[in-house]
Amino acid sequence: MSSLRPEEARKLATAASVSPLSNCQFSGVVISSIADEQKLEFTNKYKGSCTLLCSYDSQGVVLRVVSDDDRSHVLKEYMIAADTDAAQMGRRSYAVSLDADNLVLRFASDQDQQLFRKVVENVKHLRPKSVFSQRTEESSASQYFQFYGYLSQQQNMMQDYVRTSTYQRAILGNAVDFQDKIVLDVGAGSGILSFFAVQAGAAKVYAIEASNMAQYAQQLVESNNVQHKISVIPGKIEEIELPEKVDVIISEPMGYMLYNERMLETYLHARKWLKPQGKMYPTHGDLHIAPFSDESLYSEQYNKANFWYQSAFHGVDLTTLHKEGMKEYFRQPIVDTFDIRICMAKSVRHVCDFLNDKEDDLHLISIPLEFHILQTGICHGLAFWFDVEFSGSSQNVWLSTSPTAPLTHWYQVRCLLPMPIFIKQGQTLTGRVLLEANRRQSYDVTIDLHIEGTLISSSNTLDLKNPYFRYTGAPVQAPPGTSTQSPSEQYWTQVDTQGSRNSSSMLNGGLSVNGIGDGMDITHGLMHPH
């Protein structure tokens, strides 16, 4: 048996007022087991009456049983899922198969039985699937919410100083948009954005979170004494109900290449709760696309695939899989960062308007491309990054993942061409990027490029769900061939300049070697290595 803290019960009661079909409780329930199905004989499962506590879960509804006489312990916990067998028995009873138990629940009133029946129907096929469920595979959703249910993953995002500080600055810098307003936080996670909204003077914040992180957000709300301001609601925005419309929607819905994870569709769906002339933070997103040249990256992926070109690997011929291996490696988008000087043309910008675009607009995104090439070289593929703007009443604030901006946990993304193309300065590179949404909460990315006025073209289709995380933390190197002066002479000139600054130390017995050091004793390190 596990303990049920009083605050958990209060949370369930609070959530019930907002989403009654997935968060509610029933007292005075007599629970019986079916001892003999043919004779319909029943035995009491628990001594005395019980209370059923229903709470939302990404897979359905969790049903916890506690005694009416002692609510401090959970007697049993069940999961009501889409395949749960259940049937009404008379006006106050309900038969349900949970795990290995065939139970009959006798409720204290007709109304309680009817509401419980709706709870069950809410997660069964009797009820139409939500927009989220229709577009998402169950296995993908389960993995997704499990991932974001870990504190370590929330910490990874919260410790992105650029991300977190930009959101706080955008919200606090536009306090007039939040003062005494009703705010909706979509995909709240730890609730950090909800806290920022309260700092800006929000009257009420509804923090919606579908993963198990909701329980931790609730703990933070209570420990910071803002439960009168922030209401944490476990559930998906596509499925929960709010008691009122909101003035502002805040969220951090961006994924790699802006669109990955398809959280933007959830963000747009939340507009059904937004008052006319309401605000969205962020307001719009710009996806930037540019052709790039990087022989090192291309060779790295190509050589990985050549593993499968071995004809005698421990006596086994692998070459039959070389073609498939090559295809798999080049289907992987590369997540890392780079020097923007590898880009061969000015980026093309594709705008997503969070205030006006529709969810359906993000199911198939077609982006026409036209690049005027600025430098001759080999185009190995396309680079992607995004910026989002917070358009506030007082000021506009930008969050950028550009290679010229401070690095964020989104990095940048590059998509390689299996067959690179040589292109000259002054030529025009045209084509299209097609982002086709899939039920794995991601996109299939198809690239088609063509050098205008020629027969030269190249294409590739990549799986954004399966990226290669290449970033190592090492400093970004300048592209080869970008030095216009001798790097060696530049370095020694810098050293000599530093040495002249320290020359005065030599007059006081200091030691200087090649201009390095200020009274540094190098013999200690040579004779006594650590």
From Swiss-Prot:
Q: How is it modified after translation?
A: The dimethylated protein is the major form.
Q: SAM-dependent MTase PRMT-type domain: from which residue to which, for each copy?
A: 141-450
Q: What class of enzyme is it?
A: transferase
Q: Which Pfam families match?
A: PrmA, PRMT_C
Keyword field: Chromatin regulator, Cytoplasm, Methylation, Methyltransferase, Nucleus, S-adenosyl-L-methionine, Transcription, Transcription regulation, Transferase
User: What reaction gets catalysed by this protein?
Assistant: L-arginyl-[protein] + 2 S-adenosyl-L-methionine = N(omega),N(omega)-dimethyl-L-arginyl-[protein] + 2 S-adenosyl-L-homocysteine + 2 H(+)
List-wise, which residues carry Asymmetric dimethylarginine?
501
User: Which positions are annotated as binding S-adenosyl-L-methionine?
Assistant: 154, 163, 187, 209, 238, 266
Q: Which is a GO BP term held by this UniProt record?
A: regulation of DNA-templated transcription
Listed under GO cellular component are:
cytoplasm; cytosol; histone methyltransferase complex; nucleus
Q: Which GO terms describe its molecular function?
A: histone H3R17 methyltransferase activity; histone H3R2 methyltransferase activity; histone H3R26 methyltransferase activity; protein-arginine omega-N asymmetric methyltransferase activity; protein-arginine omega-N monomethyltransferase activity
Indicate where this protein resides in the cell: Cytoplasm; Nucleus
What InterPro entries does the database record attribute to this sequence? Arg_MeTrfase, PH-like_dom_sf, PRMT_dom, SAM-dependent_MTases_sf
Q: Which CDD domains match?
A: AdoMet_MTases
EC number(s) for this protein? 2.1.1.319
Which domain of life does the UniProt lineage start with?
Answer: Eukaryota
The record's subunit annotation is:
Homodimer.
Q: Which family does it belong to?
A: Belongs to the class I-like SAM-binding methyltransferase superfamily. Protein arginine N-methyltransferase family.
Q: What does this protein do?
A: Methylates (mono- and asymmetric dimethylation) the guanidino nitrogens of arginyl residues in proteins. May methylate histone H3 at 'Arg-17' and activate transcription via chromatin remodeling.
State the name under which the record lists this protein. Histone-arginine methyltransferase CARMER
Q: What is the lineage of its organism?
A: Eukaryota, Metazoa, Ecdysozoa, Arthropoda, Hexapoda
Name the gene behind this protein: Art4
